[in-house]
């Protein structure tokens, strides 16, 4: 009875209609999904990670920047050969004496360059001129023989050329700082002060004839002092001479020179005396005016004068 009521078996042709056909998505799936995972699969990048890490090729956020010119590597020359230095590099290797020699030789060969150099070169200052004179002075003293009598004829003959060089430089620099070439009397006085000090340091020799060159230099220096003092007295009432302490400085120079600058001292004294007289007169006039004003204010003006009686 039970076997009669059992469900009859499904015919085979019904299975053919109920079977599902594979879809397109299933056919495109990765065949590796059906296989087992291996340990090395954890270290392989996925498609998602690859897409996220890759930057677009046409992204405008970070444009390519060229390397600066200083960091670009220079290509080596295929064929190297010797060549002379450029003018700028050549001048860097020359010291002061060599450069002066080159410039002097060029001016000798091309006289028209001398005028151009004179107008182009900066005007020498007092310190630079005195430095040149001090260099000649140092060369002179270093040539004096050690030991023995340093003021003998032998010592004079050893340093005579250095004396000539110093005195020649002194005679060339001094007119440059005198009026009318030098318009500032303060600059001229400053130069004369330093140049006279250098002249004092020239040695005195036992033979009087050997001292003639130094004595002649003192005479020229005295004339230079007189010229500058007279020019300074014309400007500003000679205030530069009055308040610069030049009377004391020149008096000290004259004492060191053995009285060979006395003419310059006399000219300076006359200028200061004239200015002092004018100042005393102006002071006296000021005192008289103030005295009369005080008498007028106090009502005592004319009290000491005799009273005139009768017709005026």
UniProtKB/Swiss-Prot annotation:
Cross-referenced Gene3D superfamilies: Tethering factor for nuclear proteasome Cut8/Sts1
Positions of disulphide bridges: none
Localization per Swiss-Prot or TrEMBL: Cytoplasm; Nucleus
Biased segments, Basic and acidic residues type: 38-51
Keyword Hydrolase included in the entry's annotation: no
Keyword Membrane: no
Chief location: cytoplasm
PANTHER family, alphabetized: FI02826P
Protein name per Swiss-Prot or TrEMBL: Tethering factor for nuclear proteasome STS1
Organism: Ajellomyces capsulatus (strain G186AR / H82 / ATCC MYA-2454 / RMSCC 2432)
């Amino acid at each position: 009875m039970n076997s009669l009521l059992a469900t009859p078996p499904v015919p085979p042709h019904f299975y053919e209609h109920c079977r599902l056909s594979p879809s397109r998505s299933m056919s495109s799936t990765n065949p590796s999904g059906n296989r087992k995972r291996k340990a090395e699969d954890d270290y392989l990048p996925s498609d998602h990670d690859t897409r996220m890490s890759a930057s677009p090729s046409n992204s405008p956020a970070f444009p390519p920047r060229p390397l600066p010119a200083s960091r670009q590597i220079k290509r080596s020359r295929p064929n190297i050969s010797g060549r002379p230095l450029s003018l700028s590099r050549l001048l860097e290797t020359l010291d002061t004496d060599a450069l002066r020699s080159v410039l002097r030789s060029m001016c000798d060969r091309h006289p028209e360059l001398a005028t151009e150099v004179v107008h182009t070169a900066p005007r020498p200052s007092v310190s630079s001129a005195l430095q040149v004179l001090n260099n000649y002075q140092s060369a002179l003293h270093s040539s004096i023989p050690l030991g023995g009598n340093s003021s003998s004829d032998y010592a004079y003959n050893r340093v005579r050329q250095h004396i000539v060089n110093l005195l020649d430089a002194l005679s060339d620099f001094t007119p440059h700082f005198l009026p009318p070439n030098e318009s500032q009397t303060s600059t001229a006085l400053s130069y004369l002060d330093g140049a006279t000090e250098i002249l004092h340091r020239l040695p005195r020799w036992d033979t009087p004839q050997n001292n003639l060159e130094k004595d002649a230099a003192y005479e020229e220096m005295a004339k230079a002092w007189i010229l500058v003092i007279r020019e300074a007295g014309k400007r500003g009432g000679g205030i530069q001479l009055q308040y610069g302490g030049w009377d004391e400085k020149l008096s000290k120079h004259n004492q060191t020179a053995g009285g060979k600058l006395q003419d310059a001292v006399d000219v300076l004294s006359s200028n200061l005396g004239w200015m002092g007289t004018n100042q005393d007169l102006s002071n006296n006039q000021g005192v008289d005016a103030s005295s009369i004003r005080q008498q007028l204010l106090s009502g005592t003006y004319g009290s000491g004068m005799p009273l005139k009686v009768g017709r005026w």
